[in-house]
Amino acid sequence: MVMNFVRNLFFFVLAILSSFWISSFWIAQTFTPSSSYQPVEVIDGAGLYKKQRTDGNEAYLQVIDLHKMQIDQLVGEVDDMGLGQGKYYQGEGKHYSPFFKMKLFNEVTDEYKELYSHTVFSLINCSFFEQYKSSTQLSFPIKFNGEVITGGHSPYGPVSQPADKFYSNIRLKALVWDDAGAYITDYDPATGAPLNESRVKNAIVSYQYSDHPAKVLGKNQANRFHVIGTLDFDGIKGDELLLIMTVNRATLDEAADLLRQLGVKGEIITIDGGSSTYLFNSRKGNIILPQPANQEDNPTFRKLPHYLGFRTRDKKPVSPLIKVSQPADKVQVEQNKPYLILWRDNLDSDVTIELYDGDKRIEVISPRTASNGVYEWTPKSPVKEGYSLRISSLKNRKIFGTLQL
């Protein structure tokens, strides 16, 4: 009997130790690329690596663990809503396609660091856009913290009269992410799926890398590109890793092949590249900068409308801030028509949105709404020139941002 007791106790302890070892093994595991990728910065939840390619050019790999990292969409304020101009959300002409302010990359980066301090890991440019002016429409739909903020306006896509017949029947792709992981799937412009699903809070629509006009119409020339894929590394259902490959000179096929070599088996998308390509890292600084083809002819080229920021979910206190920039041109707000109020904040509580005439409050637009940077407002009465919008912290009304109308 004593021997049975000892034996059972031994196996019980062994089972506990084995369970602990296995758990520790999986917890400790992190994705590490091959030795040809040299670490630039590696933190708990993210890594930036540099690869010197055989042709002398460079590739930068970012590995983002969505269980640990936050992705923020950073988009310029709206001056014109582009009502009825959306081409890719629930049918042509069924959604708006606003004009978003083009913002200088270093101003966006500086503001992001001001909001999130030491938690910032990196920034990249993101969405394709249509006009090289002070504000621009984005090419394809974006869902930002639960709100579809544009239906897209590109002529190079599956619309009734595309700029090139190749694009009549292509399948656009949606990159969807949340705290649990990310996936890339077919996008349906007729229904808006998957962006029309309430569970989807953040998503971008873009090209499968092989459908990018630079490959199809530009004969697949080498250039600067970002390509993005997802990867399951922890063995649990779903892809928790986002892999972003940024090349300073390569074809799209070569860039995508680098992701395949790292184990990406699913869809691979591309976002805006070429002269728009931007890559910033908190340790290294600006790695790849947007470049104008001709600074005199195209001074707005270094300004871009849409960025992605990556940061840790560190809860260390930072000074609470609400940041609002004045849109590029005069704001056009019309009675009974929607207008997107956009801002950035680092608050951990809700905000209130109010309409002011000077120091006089005219209307409470929303007594309480999430501090997520976006609110669609449809004014019920005429909005006079000179009115302003005020977004204030409910915890401390002295913390606010103002948008002049």
Model regions: which residues?
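Conserved, well-ordered active-site substructure
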Residues: 133-159, 211-270, 276-318
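Active-site-adjacent helix-turn-beta-strand microarchitecture at beta-sheet edges
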Residues: 125-216
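Hydrophobic membrane-insertion alpha-helices, especially the h-region
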Residues: 10-23
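Zymogen propeptides
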Residues: 24-166, 245
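Conserved beta-alpha junction segments in alpha/beta enzyme cores
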Residues: 47-63, 74, 195-234
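Extended, solvent-exposed regions of the mature portions of secreted/cell-surface glycoproteins
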Residues: 320-405
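Active-site neighborhood of phospho(di)ester-bond hydrolases with catalytic His/Asp-centered motifs
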Residues: 123-126, 268-272
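N-terminal Sec-pathway targeting helices
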Residues: 1-13
